[in-house]
Amino acid sequence: MLGSLLLLAPLAGAAVIGSRADTKQCPGYKASNVQENDRSLTADLTLAGKPCNTYGTDLQNLKLLVEYQTDERLHVKIYDAEERVYQVPEKVTPRVDSGDGSSKDSALKFEYEEEPFSFTVKRDDEVLFDSSAENLIFQSQYLKLRTWLPENPYLYGLGEHTDPLRLSTTNYTRTFWNRDAYGTPANSNLYGTHPVYYDHRGESGTHGVFLLNSNGMDVFIDKTADGKQYLEYNALGGIFDFYFFTGSNPKEASIEYSKIVGLPAMQSYWTFGLHQCRYGYRDVYQVAEVVYNYTKAGIPLETMWTDIDYMDRRRVFSLDPDRFPLEKMRELVGYLHDHDQHYIVMVDPAVSVSDNGAFNRGLEQDVFLKTQNGSLYKGAVWPGVTAYPDWFHPDIQDYWNSEFSTFFNAETGVDIDGLWIDMNEASNFCPDPCTDPERYSSENNLPPAPPPVRSSSPRPLPGFPADFQPSSASRSQKRIVKAKVGLEGRDLLNPPYKIRNEAGSLSNKTINTGIVHAGEGYAEYDTHNLYGTMMSSSSREAMQYRRPEVRPLVITRSTYAGAGRDVGHWLGDNFSKWEHYRISIAEGLAFASMFQVPMVGADVCGFAGNTTEELCARWASLGAFFTFYRNHNEIGNIGQEFYVWPTVAESARKAIDIRYRLLDYIYTSFYKQSQTGEPFLQPVFYLYPEDENTFSIDLQFFYGDAILVSPVPDKGLTSVDAYFPDDIFYDWYTGTPVRGHGANITLSNIDITHIPLHIRGGSIIPIRSSSAMTTTELREKSFQLIIAPGLDGTASGSLYLDDGDSLEQKATLEVEFEYRKGVLHIDGKFELHASLVESVTLLGQGKGGSRARREDGTKKTIQTNLELSKPTEIKLE
């Protein structure tokens, strides 16, 4: 959340496209001392000629390590012989085991040329990666490697960005340097770094390439003058630490990636409800009024959020004593909990440099970043002059745990249920060089003035405590440099190679890259892209420290590869524009399916600027089919809570009704991803990997394996040209079969409160019999089963249930459904008591039998009142 403050400080230098000195004369390396066995290969790499020293000093001696880790994964690591060059710390990215794979059984084959050294990775004699396109460069502050690609490749990934799902292959640059990117502009570096790409090749399969490197980087995708396609890495440091992985289809490739960066965290049942937030709620009374208005409008609100407005002068771990006093905050949270609702607030990393508890305790424990002369490093953010936690400090977790357990104490503080962390790229409003953050804060009115104080709510809020009603109704540290932490003598502020950072210099609007962290002695230059993910890990641990037995929900803005192990992600400060509505689909799909961060969603209706009734109504429907569903907007703009407009309210009620009835399907699919890496939200080509027409689709998607979502894409439209692959589908609302033939079908007369949904043939979907106002109430509803037979007449599905919140489950329900030859087979593990299955609906039917309650030529529903307690068979035809 940056907002209008961007206008107050121009960028320190325009964005510069990665500088391109002539590197073609660089000699590359020669391989020698090659040692090879069935599981691995090692070699020495020696500079093959006179150093070119284009953007630093060429390293004379390197090492090569190749590991056949599994049949589907190959590890190729090129690093300095002395192992002094920085490598991503294992505490951030735990390394996978080297495995027990072998070259004989591996689907991937490694081949190399000795001089100049280059390597290829093949799958069934098909070249997937070929570094012979240019000589390898490994310098003190610059690494370069180029691989050939096939003509017109289908590439995906390389996030975070707001470009199309399928990446451009001409004159395209992806830059990795996390920044506070207000408005999430296209063709620029945004909040996160995910240096992995997927290359989908239809029938021959899908493979991915993950470069474990956290340094600033440009990735170029382009063609040579003679038309040859390539992809090129240009990094400011680190090593080449590649993981190649493959699958017969993109879903399998995504599963393989999860084995490298880690499986995503399972979320609590309630987190899939509707969330409401706004930057600019003036006091606790307005927050309470929003909660009341949702109830009054009959729109289920699961979780209420508060932005930095609750803080005393924007200081973390504080409450505005006049607008958000502790007593009232505890009453608000108590009301929410009494009504089976939840509460979340924001915590930023930057701590106000002032006489306050969080700063004083951090100063005493010496856990803030320091300059090289040992003084406190200071920036400027919302509270004014700030210090930044050093996530590498050995005592940082104790400090963070203590602040959380005190401020968010269930008995004496604000008893939050989840956490929102923001500004953790890290953001710094003070432009580079930030030599006087005090003056900058003063000149830019940081912290901003709060709104006038109110003593009570201006309107009655039935059900809230008496004091919520109108007055008429009631009243320098030494750093030790070790191995793998970075070469000495580098220019950490202005490296010779300039990546295309939209903010200009590396330190502009963020932490100074010359800072050296406590503990191991890592430089911010190398670890900048890890700051947000390290805050995420520490924050998740702090949340578990105060509530050890439950799953913590943490939503972050900044991410690095593997962040899904700890957190979910919202897509940042978007605009209330149709193009942002559309691009949120591609963004969400990339995070959920390719980056293994499945708890993801955009600010519904848009964050910045004034939304419109039509846009918000459409977005209320679309947002319901992401995993994370939150309405949020910016101070100074019109209110956009779903109850503000009648059509938006109706759209939200209809979409939430469907979402909540599907919540166990969502929960089951999410659980599966947390256990296996199999994606829940998926691009269309994930399910139809041999249909080339699907490879570029990013305005439709699958909500799990069973539901095709085809939103209306633009203003003023009441129709959508939806692509239906060669398969059978069923209209969600009517059950009418739709036979796809690999072509578009125009869906017409789509009301503003409606979103087209189709069930994929071959699916069995468990749904609740009706929706509810809270997820707690929802869990008491009975089940229904929808059977949508595929072209072969069969269908399958599953249901997973647990207590919905605990980290460790004492009992679960894990049921598999199969339909074949007119019989429904139910089997599985039945430890947990579940609601009855009151009915089974079979789609695609003509006249039904005597047990059919309803027959209309498209479906029949059979009353069952079945208890899910043992294996069962039900004859349906």
UniProtKB/Swiss-Prot annotation:
GO biological process: cell wall organization; polysaccharide catabolic process
Organism domain of life: Eukaryota
Compartments reported by the entry: Secreted
Enzyme class (EC, first level): hydrolase
Record field: transmembrane: none
This enzyme's EC code(s): 3.2.1.20, 3.2.1.21
UniProt-annotated catalytic positions: D422 (nucleophile), E425, D573 (proton donor)
Chief place of localization: secreted
GO cellular component, one term: extracellular region
Biased composition (Pro residues): 447-463
CDD domains in alphabetical order: GH31_MGAM_SI_GAA, GH31_N
Keyword list, A-Z: Carbohydrate metabolism, Cell wall biogenesis/degradation, Glycoprotein, Glycosidase, Hydrolase, Polysaccharide degradation, Secreted, Signal
Signal peptide stretch: 1-14
Entry GO MF terms: alpha-1,4-glucosidase activity; beta-glucosidase activity; carbohydrate binding
Pfam families named in the record: Gal_mutarotas_2, Glyco_hydro_31_2nd, Glyco_hydro_31_3rd
Glycan-bearing residues: N171, N293, N373, N508, N574, N610, N744
Catalytic activity from the UniProt record: Hydrolysis of terminal, non-reducing (1->4)-linked alpha-D-glucose residues with release of alpha-D-glucose; Hydrolysis of terminal, non-reducing beta-D-glucosyl residues with release of beta-D-glucose
Keyword hit for Glycoprotein: yes
Region entry Disordered, spans: 432-476
Family the UniProt entry places it in: Belongs to the glycosyl hydrolase 31 family.
Protein function: Glucosidase involved in the degradation of cellulosic biomass. Has both alpha- and beta-glucosidase activity.
Protein's recorded name: Probable alpha/beta-glucosidase agdC
